[in-house]
Amino acid sequence: MSPPAHSPRGPRTSAARPRVAFLGPSGTFTEQALLSQPDLAAAECVPIRSISETIFEVDSGRAELGVVPIENAIEGSVNETLDTLAFEASEHLFIHREIVVPVDLNLCVKPGTKLSDVTTVVSIPHASAQCRDWLATKLPGVEVQASNSTAEAARHVSKARTAGRAAIAPSLAAKLYGLEVVAAGIHDHPDNSTRFWMIGHGIPARTGHDKSTVVVFQTHQDRPGGLLTILQEFNARGINLTKIESRPTKRELGSYCFIIDFEGHLSDELVADVLRSLAAKHEVRLLGSYAAAGREAGARRQAVGKAWREASRWVDGLRARVQLP
């Protein structure tokens, strides 16, 4: 899908009540992620039909911020989010923070429907996959249909004329659309959670507990050791990687880029230094430097940063002793 025409004028301004787009309709885990942020309690929350459209809503300036899913603990990355941000959105759009929400998946039906009545299950493919074993055991042979979101599945079931349809959705969506939970907690793994990105224009200030995400396009893909040379840049500076994966660049068959999450913020000298080195050798795009959901990253970065500063002072002391010609 191509992005709508937009200009890099930045977001519309509304300090009192920011407009925040999210993957809708109401009742999605994405909305739960948005509502979990105290500083957005007064925001105008706008449900959008798809992930890419949510991103373009912010990119165009029609919304100040947006919230989209990026990774599930069981099913991995949400490729639509990665690809839209990496290849289609403008370079004025950045990740502002990450939000982690525990996943609570239930089988939701119209009131009075029994589990034995269910013939069709509807949900977003990521959610259906997280319940694969449960479905195979409890509803073998059931037809599984795709929707844009868990809440969209719940809304679809609420409007269905037949009683044999069920939605895999959170309890919030079941309540919102007048459905009953016929089976609760049907996800196959108990410690399931989903990570979300909040996106907006500009790069937010350093918090001390930050992560960054960068896309690296290899200049020479036919040379061995390409990934190793990229990883060595981070290792040499003591920067911890939290995630790395490859994605097709959409340019030609066999052409891949690396999307890397790592600890630290652009304002950190070590992070700025690794980006300089990468950009000198490869095509690089920074997707964001943003507040991390946990505080472990900050503690590690502070320790590494202190060691690096001490080493820099030592080198500066030696250089000060160099005699002038």
Predicted features by range, described:
Residues M1-P325:
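Domain-level signature for soluble enzymes in the chorismate/prephenate branch of the shikimate pathway
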